Amino acid sequence: LSQVPICPTGYRNEAKDQLVGEQIDLMLRKEAVEVVPGPYPGEGYYYRIFLVQKSSGKWRPVIDLKRLNKSLVVPRFKMESITTVWNSLIPGNYTFSIDLTDAYFHIPIFPGHRKYLRFVYQGVVYQFKALPFGLSSAPWIFTKVMTQVKAMVHIQGVMLLLYLDDWLVQIGDYNTGTLQSSYMVELCHRLGLLVNSEKSELVPKQQFQFIGGQFDLLNNRVYPKEQNMTKLLQVIEVFLTSSFRTAREYQSLLGLMGSQDRYIQWARLERRVPQRFLLDNWNQFRDSQDVLLPVPPHVKEALLWWKRQHVSPLGVPLVPPQFTHRVFTDASTKGWGAHSGQLQ
């Protein structure tokens, strides 16, 4: 805690510094922050505020709360994931989605605690009066509050899935979906929740994107999102046109593959080729992250397989088919074996 305002916010780049000022003015209009009039009574925590560019190209102000976050204990909590959403979806159903604008700013900060969330810009002291981005407990707080909305609408028969400010509602038919969509928008309005009409999909659909996947409830399929595959293919193209890449780049490639392999049939098997090559030729405890490794023909052949998946995507079943056979296998340094029915 400091009696004197410290950590002034500012960029040497004049254009970026102007963007910071514009975002602070915007937060003032949204009543997310407030000016602390001087002289400054009592103590406060002062931090730097910076901008993070969103996928839309717009800017999000984030306060650097690393020091405060070290003192916070965030309880464990359940939040929707791609797995829970996937398991909840039913082929043939419809969905619509709601995206909230400035989600965290819907949660007010207790007046006595706002002094812990201060920053200085051009000699003026500000403090957050709404939940800021950058606080480690923010996802937990926001989810706990919005879970009450979820419980309320479940009583009304609305199947709502929450992933922070991205909401997905599943319904059995189109007409019911239009009614529930209108109900949810009206409810958000009554609760003071701002709906982002540009990013929301309020018309019931059977083909939609949510979190990391492209879902097709009509044909019982799930595909990777186009932008995620494009990012992966850009890295693959670099490897295909190179003779050597660093171990760090190999790990980045494998990480991108791992994020998409659940959406692509046999992807985990094909990922094993570059993964095995890295394990055989590099030791993370001994070798540098920047050591150069070759990109041999068999690795490039495996990468071409991934490239073909983007040209002709097959996806994976939303609901897997019933199994007709069970095969049990085991292996050791001395041998291997398999068992299926009466066959061994």
Residues of each region from the PLM?
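Reverse-transcribing Pol proteins
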Residues: 1-77, 124, 161-166, 264-300
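Reverse-transcriptase-like RNA-dependent polymerase core
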Residues: 1-4, 52-60, 101-126, 142-151, ...
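Conserved pre-motif C helix in the palm subdomain of viral-like polymerases
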Residues: 27, 58, 93, 104, ...
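Conserved catalytic palm subdomain of right-hand nucleotidyl-transferase polymerases, strongest
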Residues: 56-69, 85-109, 249-252, 327-329
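RNase H-like nuclease fold core
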Residues: 316-344
